[in-house]
UniProtKB/Swiss-Prot annotation:
Family: Belongs to the ATG27 family.
Domain MRH intervals: 19-167
Gene: ATG27
GO BP field: autophagy; protein transport
Transmembrane portions of the chain: 210-230
Species name: Kluyveromyces lactis (strain ATCC 8585 / CBS 2359 / DSM 70799 / NBRC 1267 / NRRL Y-1140 / WM37) (Yeast)
Name of the protein in its database record: Autophagy-related protein 27
Length: 285
């Protein structure tokens, strides 16, 4: 009697045959727990027609048992049913593939779809694996777009529908955690510069003068070098390269030696010219 009572109580307890997607780091971001996922693929196998019906519900939060094929186990999270029909006759079920919650589950995010791999389902003496891809398509309730067997034990299925889309708040995130697709957070760094500050901080006047003097020095050096080369070549154009080199070295040495005195004379003339013009502004009484 106690055994029968315990069995009855256990049968009344709810069981969880799927994954709690809300606690899964990846599945929690997708709408996979909001929709029933299923599809049918039909293949001509003359004289018969082969049909594969697929059903998926990996989230415990969504109850889609009403859409599960009759041949599948109520504890399945993924199930496939193969049936064959001859013209004018009822279809015959030839294969039922049950993937219960005991199979290994691997979830990945790819650029094209949400990838779900189920492996280790027992089918007679064989082991079956399923690679399922959920692509995002906002409109409609979803459909099976691709179904293929890579070998006798591995099937690949591609579903397209809203279940493959990210939930609001998980797509188009920017660096501030909002959905406005920009990195502005309202602080002073986001304010546009005024018209006078478009180029940032302006360089000081001394920096502009220094740059001008550097360019002037570079041009003067280039012109002096050209002058020395041309003059040395003109004086030794009928001689050898050694003659040209000696002439160039001598002229360069002389130029470098006389340059300070030349610069001093130029500076003196500039200063004297300024003083003379200043004195010219006074008249004798």
């Amino acid at each position: 009697m106690k055994v029968l009572l315990a069995t009855a109580l256990v049968s009344l307890l709810p069981f969880s045959s799927a994954v709690e997607c809300s606690k899964n780091e990846i599945l929690n971001k997708y709408r996979v727990n909001e929709f029933s996922i299923g599809g049918v693929s039909v293949q001509d196998t003359p004289p018969s027609e082969t049909k594969e019906s697929w059903w998926l519900n990996i989230c415990d939060e969504h109850d889609s048992k009403s859409s599960i094929p009759d041949q599948c186990n109520v504890k399945d999270i993924f199930c496939g049913v193969t049936s064959v029909a001859l013209p004018g006759k009822e279809s015959i079920v030839t294969k039922v593939m049950d993937f219960t919650s005991s199979v290994a589950l691997e979830v990945k995010e790819t650029a094209e779809a949400l990838s779900i791999r189920l492996s280790g389902a027992a089918w007679g003496s064989h082991i079956l694996n399923a690679d399922i891809y959920l692509q995002c398509q906002e409109k409609g309730s979803g459909s099976l777009t691709e179904s293929s067997w890579t070998d006798d034990q591995n099937v690949k299925l591609v579903f397209s529908g809203p279940f493959g889309c990210l939930k609001k708040g998980n797509d188009n995130k920017d660096g501030n955690g909002d959905d406005d697709n920009n990195d502005k957070d309202g602080d002073d760094s986001d304010k546009k510069p005024h018209d006078g500050d478009k180029n940032g901080s302006k360089p000081k006047g001394g920096a502009g003068l220094g740059s001008w003097l550097v360019w002037l020095f570079m041009y003067a050096t280039i012109f002096a070098l050209i002058y020395l080369v041309v003059t040395s070549y003109m004086n030794t154009r009928n001689g050898s390269f050694n003659d040209f080199r000696e002439e160039f070295v001598d002229r360069s040495t002389t130029f470098a030696t006389n340059l300070p005195q030349f610069a001093k004379e130029v500076a003196g003339k500039i200063v004297n010219s300024g003083s003379s013009s200043q004195r010219g502004g006074y008249s004798a009484v």
